[in-house]
């Protein structure tokens, strides 16, 4: 079956159920290795197993396409059934792929794998795939390193998929595939060592046990393009859909956004208290499990940094409350008594402000600790089978997850108490919200879909902003850009791995090509070796610098002990360079990124004010013009 809409020719092979799109004479076809399928607990079920499959050409007021119906699974009339609709929008030639559940009987679905991955077999550096794992990744088809499993299984709106799209370019022709229903979906990708191919496709998962709603992937095809063009397609998309809010707009809402621009970031803590049941508990070295730094000591450190010449700084404080870092959440008050209590904390905050610095705290409204004073399983996230997820990964030991419907209430309760003690917060970091997937809760008293969970998380950010407190979270995610002012970091994936780990592609600032002027991103500044200085990535991305980054967990989340130690004055000097650039370009669009050689050793970014940053990672050299 074949139909045309302008320069788009859409074809369906009715025997294999594979599609082909011809766009301005360039052919994009699903790989012969791809079979549309549903994955269940009992195995994979190809779409061809449905006994009654019909394809009908249709047209409507905005486009035309092919409507397919799948009925009579295993010959049963009253059985699991679904439709697919593939159509071309006439006004912009977007090709929409839609999978729609009709009758959800008899099958317990784990994933739907549709639409298919493209045939992309030529082992050429001119052919490459774009993935949104972390800040972004470009995989040439001839890349020597095999692609590892994606973080969070490639789930959209996690650190494995900051933005819900992927793309491919071959000899100057390309496509971007945008998930317009990203909440229960993700990508899977395969690239063997040396290529010659890269395959990338989409998976959809159930919501609260059922597929429940239409799943949509939108393809835009371009000629004479590169990855910059695909990013700008998505930038226009998020503007059209109301997801884009610039720092300029956020500063109108909360003027202190302007004060944060150009700051160096200091990340440190007060109290560590590792539960003996925690995976992090070290019985051989008990001194590592429990220790306290007083508020007064942190106050003195801030004064020392001022004496060394630091003038713009944001202090992010972990473990400031009595339970200790990652303990008893969401019941995380009062301020740590042994460290000085509310009075000591207020003195620290007041001193930071007297020095012209900004101050914020770490907090957590997802991890729900079983020993929290008000813990009640009735408010935990319930899975569809009635159970609750549990683990003891973090310092606080055994935990489950707080249902996201409850998070805004606890934010309001806790911060009302904090503010009542005269503590003026410039910012607050709500842990994991923009890194981990949204939760789903099957408890009928507070049922919540993943999409709704993101809205509840956003409500927490908005409440903070309403009080003049700048919102922050662990990483960055597409859903949060209306309400997130800054983050802990937005790194390339390799930065979260041990130094020296081979890169599974060329790190690329895909996120910043879309959202640079929407969010403030602090960057790690470690000089890992003579040929790996993370400062160059901070400059390339026009980001803010970390002056001190004392991670709560050693060798976790990019907090590694190895690396060349630099004197503090040298650290300050380096941060001044990065912060100075950030002050200049923070509100500018990153209009262009260039790879100046085949391996990404030399790169350049251009910002909308005309500023260019060129880096050479091998020579540890940068140039700002």
Locations of regions flagged by a protein language model:
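Active-site-proximal substrate-binding groove within the catalytic cores of carbohydrate-active enzymes
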Residues: 15, 19-24, 171-173, 181-186, ...
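Conserved, mostly hydrophobic/aromatic
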Residues: 7, 99, 305, 352, ...
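Aromatic-lined carbohydrate-binding/catalytic grooves of carbohydrate-active enzymes
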Residues: 258-413, 423-428, 434-446
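Short acidic, gly/pro-rich beta-turn/loop elements at beta-sheet edges
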Residues: 13, 31, 78, 107-109, ...
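Generic detector of solvent-exposed, compositionally biased contiguous segments
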Residues: 1-6, 39-54, 391, 503-524
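Short, surface-exposed, polar/charged, turn-prone segments marking secondary-structure boundaries
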Residues: 31-32, 38-40, 48-49, 342-345, ...
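Short loop/turn segments at secondary-structure transitions that flank enzyme active sites
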Residues: 105, 118, 321, 365-367, ...
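Carbohydrate-recognition beta-sandwich/jelly-roll modules
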Residues: 2-315, 320, 337-339, 355-358
